[in-house]
């Protein structure tokens, strides 16, 4: 290949390339990594409402639920041990994401996906055959280790493999897989709840999505970015040519090598994140995943059956309602695949925030009007139940085409290569910290804040929408290695990012 002069600056650069069948299939297979995360989110809440599961592992919760059926509905499921069962996974995911950063950088994205699948598979088997609470907890920890690795590697893999014009749509495949996993889990919970040992099938069924990503990672190629990072220049060149479906890849391969050479000068990527020029990246790595969880979505998806049961639905009706929200989740995520590269990230963030705000206030008013502050139960009229489910579905739809997919897409596409693995690790870690905290205290918050819990999350939706409006630049249609120019042109972040244009010549 001849030497090529590459200008990296504020001028927009367009790399040639097509949306080939090869890259589409590759990204679909990789996106399946989201199935394990989604399946766990959906299965946990449903299993905890099954009488046979409660009787075996959490008898105090079961007895309290049956004994106090006519008392405060807000506090029926308030149990430290029950919430620890759900939230312990996220502490494990937090720890493993830090290790996954090193593995992803040194050994490639696909190795991290493979480890994630194997660990999740082991946890699923242990949970399926559990006979004591400690087996459940250890199984949950293994599941968490697996999720930490996949959530670290899959979004990066998708952003690096996809042509920049289609990066948003292909990356959202990860979130779509999460929503499909949630839906499948809710459907299985509904059917398995009829069987006395159905909880074993629900928990053990996690082996299936684990095997999908495990086998998938064995046949997937690694990304050209990762190959170059590990010195495999010729292999990366051949792979990029196959991925893009064109021979003219000189500009893109040179920019990838420039980014790789810059990354090698960084001895301590974690410490480097604290440098002034990476201030916008670090801010987004922390606040976007934190805000994603403060929308309250995982409260709905974790505990949808518990929540619906709490507000007066029967056990079967609660699981059916959870299936309905799961269907909405999948459908709205498909909308985001269409719209993210057409309407842009900022539009979806802001529209979704407004829609979530209205829905949360409406749900709070509906639940508050029915149960008041003392949680006095009563028979929920059918029309009233439909109204509650309708607004929850509107809320889920808003999240599913905004903060759901974009909470993973935007961080994975804005980090330069030299800090990419470390910054993505922070994104996953913050996501898991907030997921753990909210999952751990949700039932207690429901007991004390009552319907005000939805107002609590609505407040943060307002805060995050203001943040997006003021501080998040549009990243649609910007090549991943050219992302620095969006910070240079931003009214605030330009103060931190070096505005000088660099002219670099690289000879391969």
From Swiss-Prot:
Main location: membrane
GO cellular component: membrane
Transmembrane segments: 23-43, 80-100, 118-138, 141-161, 172-192, 201-221, 294-314, 317-337, 347-367, 383-403, 426-446, 451-471
Pfam families on file: Sugar_tr
Cell compartments where the protein resides: Membrane
GO-annotated molecular function: monosaccharide transmembrane transporter activity; symporter activity
Family: Belongs to the major facilitator superfamily. Sugar transporter (TC 2.A.1.1) family.
Main function: Mediates an active uptake of hexoses, probably by sugar/hydrogen symport.
Name of the protein this chain belongs to: Sugar transport protein 12
């Amino acid at each position: 290949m001849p030497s090529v002069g590459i200008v990296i600056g504020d001028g927009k650069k367009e790399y040639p390339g097509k949306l080939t069948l090869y890259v589409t299939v590759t990204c679909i297979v990789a996106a399946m990594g989201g199935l394990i995360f989604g399946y766990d989110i959906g299965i946990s809440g449903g299993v905890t409402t099954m009488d046979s599961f409660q009787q075996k592992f959490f008898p105090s919760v079961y007895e309290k639920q049956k004994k106090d059926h006519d008392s405060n509905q807000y506090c029926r499921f308030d149990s430290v041990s029950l919430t620890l069962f759900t939230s312990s996974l996220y502490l494990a995911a937090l720890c493993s994401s830090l290790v996954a950063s090193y593995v992803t950088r040194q050994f490639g994205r696909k190795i991290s996906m493979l480890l994630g699948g194997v660990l999740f598979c082991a946890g699923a088997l242990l949970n399926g055959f559990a006979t004591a609470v400690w087996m459940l907890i250890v199984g949950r920890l293994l599941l968490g280790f697996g999720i930490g690795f996949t959530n670290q590697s899959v979004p990066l893999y998708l952003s690096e493999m996809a042509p920049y014009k289609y990066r948003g749509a292909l990356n959202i495949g990860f979130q779509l897989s999460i929503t499909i996993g949630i839906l499948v889990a809710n459907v299985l919970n509904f059917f398995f709840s009829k069987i006395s040992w159905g909880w074993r099938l629900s928990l053990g069924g996690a082996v299936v999505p684990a095997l999908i990503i495990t086998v998938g990672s064995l046949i997937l190629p690694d990304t050209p970015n990762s190959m170059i990072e590990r010195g495999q220049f010729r292999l990366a060149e051949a792979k990029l040519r196959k991925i893009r479906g064109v021979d003219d890849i000189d500009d893109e391969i040179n920019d990838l090598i420039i980014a790789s050479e810059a990354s090698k000068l960084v001895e301590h990527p974690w410490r480097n994140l604290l440098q002034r020029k990476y201030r916008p990246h670090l801010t987004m790595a922390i606040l976007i995943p934190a805000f994603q969880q403060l929308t309250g979505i995982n409260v709905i998806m974790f505990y949808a059956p518990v929540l619906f049961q709490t507000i007066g639905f029967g056990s079967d009706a609660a699981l059916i309602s959870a299936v309905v929200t799961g269907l909405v989740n999948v459908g709205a995520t498909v909308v985001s695949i269409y719209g993210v590269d057409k309407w842009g990230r900022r539009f979806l963030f802001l529209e979704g925030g407004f829609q979530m705000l209205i829905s949360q206030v409406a749900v709070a008013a509906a639940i508050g009007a029915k149960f008041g502050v003392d949680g006095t139960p009563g028979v929920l009229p059918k029309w009233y139940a439909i109204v509650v489910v309708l607004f929850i579905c509107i809320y889920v739809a808003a999240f599913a085409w905004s903060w759901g997919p974009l909470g993973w897409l935007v961080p994975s596409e804005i980090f330069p290569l030299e800090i990419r693995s470390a910054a993505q690790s922070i994104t996953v870690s913050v996501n898991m910290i907030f997921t753990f905290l909210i999952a751990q205290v949700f039932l207690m918050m429901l007991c004390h804040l009552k319907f005000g819990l939805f107002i609590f999350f609505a407040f943060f939706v307002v805060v995050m929408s203001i943040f997006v409006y003021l501080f998040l630049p549009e990243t649609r249609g910007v090549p991943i290695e050219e992302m620095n120019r969006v910070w240079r042109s931003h009214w605030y972040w330009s103060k931190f990012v070096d505005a000088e244009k660099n002219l670099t010549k690289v000879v391969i």
